[in-house]
């Protein structure tokens, strides 16, 4: 089967990753030790996408857990699903990266990277037909951002034809951990533009907003945020894990979603978002879910798609729904919001359907959109980057690890290029696109 190797790096990556594994273990009927006690054949049918089968009906996640300090790893190991993972797959250093991208990418991380690649290689060799890799990390820290991008580029070298999907937590202005986040994020985006095939952008600020506004939680914990992220990750990967009428895998998703190779940063959303106590009081219908899904308040990245246009988007339905209902509703939404979709990509909305709903819900809807509005997110980080870099603030932490100022300048201009590429396609109309082709066409000679 089409296996995926999962990597989680840094504190954020490991916590999101742990929530993800907890979530999908439940969906596949595994208990906290990985022993199968589910009821449905469908849970077993494609178990091998994410799990290796060990002896005694036990399943082990195909996950590699990486960090430069032991703290988070110990927390994962001591957590409810700590016994699930293979002990050899925990790879950690002792020193920590101290939120310094250069430490993760060039010094501390570079020392550990070969150990990690050995584990990745071992997992990949055990696969029947490896589909690709997915990595969870944050872009604001040292290990997830610096070492995470180092791993991505090393894996890219070794497996150039496999898919690379990343779930990247982008630093947000209101919820900031450290002052150097803009540096780390810009340097990471510089790497992701070149080396990742699809990047799902998740934003702490948007997650907090969802928790406060929609879920009515007065002070959300990171556990609540991770719970939201794991719902989206589970949704995006549904089609791979369960049989359905319209299955898409990572590659199909990329083919349908990425019109130009550099523009592979997606916004994700999930519906129904109801607080944990409220969902037993109301039924959800396909129209309601579709409405919710296109609501900016449901997006997990803090940029409003109404300020941009969708190049492409993909909707993944889960539950017992008729394909016709879904198609009708999607058409309905498209007709109402046609101004938010570019006209020069016809049929730019793809729908996939899986008949198995997530735990505790009748049906759910995961949304992945490639919108030009994501440039707001990069602009925001870029402005903060420029403000600090102009004064060369905090730069000695990076140059001390052997980085050059030139690298910062390159990363900055690459990110600015990305923003202007998004802007260019946002403004492009059908006529302009056609004119470009007409200019290229050879003139017919008069006879």
UniProtKB/Swiss-Prot annotation:
| Region feature Disordered, mapped onto this chain | 426-447
Gene Ontology cellular-component terms for this entry are:
cytoplasm; microtubule
Query: What are the transmembrane regions?
Result: none
The record describes its quaternary structure and partners as: Dimer of alpha and beta chains. A typical microtubule is a hollow water-filled tube with an outer diameter of 25 nm and an inner diameter of 15 nM. Alpha-beta heterodimers associate head-to-tail to form protofilaments running lengthwise along the microtubule wall with the beta-tubulin subunit facing the microtubule plus end conferring a structural polarity. Microtubules usually have 13 protofilaments but different protofilament numbers can be found in some organisms and specialized cells.
Family label? Belongs to the tubulin family.
PANTHER family linked: TUBULIN
Q: What is this protein called?
A: Tubulin beta-2 chain
What is the gene called?
Answer: TUB2
